[in-house]
């Protein structure tokens, strides 16, 4: 089976690796173009999928759009049986969707129709969902609206971070995709339309959302911290030894106590919220590495959280 793989971030890599490892012929990899990196933006960084594809000698394409006739002709010339799309980052026009003999299949990190869109892992945790999952769907022209081929649910534990859920769903996605490809080969892949009820959208994370609002209930603050960990990272300003610093918050738990929002309630960094309190467990100063709260506090006095 001739496969075109379309993906960009680290989340996509285990799925690409599994497809290669199971002997499928990956004739091309499509990914986002290299991005400027470094302090001055003078270096170009290739995506994780780009790096992995080149390791296996797979031709890599990095168009900025697939809407043009030239790019669509190049894609069609690959004569793919199927395209596998996992966090690619570009919309696929109808000409691309129709080109592979068996269609295009997407690995999506939510239980559709909940959390269609760009940031389903973060949004599920930030909303306090108790479960999510991984789905394989056949793509149509809508935003994550196609019929579902396979799904697996995953419990979201109370302190699970987006990074932990990301890694879990990526591995599940690799297994599901291999099963889906096998069923496609056997012509036994059954498709079920998505439910019409329960549609929500996982908008891309805005940088402004990363600043913690201590006037919110503790459960919302905790969900924001873990939902934005490790990237982009929730943050706040702290008065440390009399100076105000910006600090990233990587882990937390629900704490006990109450007070004016932002009040430091004890020497274990329990912070009062609009309702209840949150205990900060892992923090990161600018230019530093993430540290457990006890180590973060060594020789430091936090008097205020803003």
Swiss-Prot record:
Pfam families: Formyl_trans_C (PF02911), Formyl_trans_N (PF00551)
Amino-acid positions noted as binding (6S)-5,6,7,8-tetrahydrofolate in the UniProt annotation, renumbered to this chain: 110-113
GO CC annotations, alphabetized: cytosol
Species whose genome carries this gene: Brucella abortus (strain 2308)
Record's function text: Attaches a formyl group to the free amino group of methionyl-tRNA(fMet). The formyl group appears to play a dual role in the initiator identity of N-formylmethionyl-tRNA by promoting its recognition by IF2 and preventing the misappropriation of this tRNA by the elongation apparatus.
GO molecular function: methionyl-tRNA formyltransferase activity
Annotated keywords: Protein biosynthesis, Transferase
InterPro entries: Fmt, Formyl_trans_C, Formyl_trans_C_sf, Formyl_transf_N, Formyl_transf_N_sf, Formyl_transferase-like_C_sf, GART_AS, Met-tRNA-FMT_C
Biological classification of the source: Bacteria, Pseudomonadati, Pseudomonadota, Alphaproteobacteria, Hyphomicrobiales
Name of the protein in question: Methionyl-tRNA formyltransferase
CDD domains in the record: FMT_core_Met-tRNA-FMT_N (cd08646), Met_tRNA_FMT_C (cd08704)
Gene3D superfamilies to which the protein is assigned, alphabetical: Formyl transferase, C-terminal domain, Formyl transferase, N-terminal domain
């Amino acid at each position: 089976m001739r496969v075109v793989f379309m993906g960009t971030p680290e989340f996509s890599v285990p799925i690409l690796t599994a497809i290669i490892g199971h002997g499928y012929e990956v004739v091309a990899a499509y990914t986002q173009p290299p991005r400027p990196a470094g302090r001055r933006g003078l270096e170009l960084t290739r995506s994780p999928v780009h790096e992995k594809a080149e390791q296996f000698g797979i031709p890599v394409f990095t168009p900025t759009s697939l809407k043009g006739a030239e790019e669509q002709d190049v894609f069609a010339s690959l004569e793919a049986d199927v395209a596998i799309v996992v966090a690619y980052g570009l919309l696929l026009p109808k000409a691309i969707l129709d080109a592979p003999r068996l269609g295009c299949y997407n690995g999506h990190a939510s239980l559709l129709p909940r959390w269609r869109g760009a940031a389903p892992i973060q949004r599920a945790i930030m909303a306090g969902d108790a479960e999510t999952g991984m789905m394989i769907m056949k793509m149509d022209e809508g935003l994550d609206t196609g019929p579902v081929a396979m799904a697996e649910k995953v419990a979201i534990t109370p302190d699970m971070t987006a990074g932990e859920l990301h890694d879990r769903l990526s591995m599940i996605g690799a297994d599901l995709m291999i099963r889906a490809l096998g069923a496609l080969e056997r012509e036994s892949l059954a498709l079920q339309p998505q439910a019409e009820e329960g549609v929500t959208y996982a908008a891309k994370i805005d940088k402004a959302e990363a600043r913690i609002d201590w006037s919110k209930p503790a459960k919302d603050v905790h969900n924001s911290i873990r939902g934005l960990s490790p990237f982009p990272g929730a943050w706040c300003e702290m008065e440390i030894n009399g100076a105000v610093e910006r600090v990233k918050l990587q882990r937390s738990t629900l704490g006990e106590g109450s007070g004016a929002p932002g009040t430091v309630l004890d020497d274990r960094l329990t912070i009062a919220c609009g309702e209840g309190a949150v205990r900060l467990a892992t923090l990161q100063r600018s230019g530093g590495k993430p540290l457990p709260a006890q180590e973060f506090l060594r020789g430091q006095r936090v008097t205020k959280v803003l």
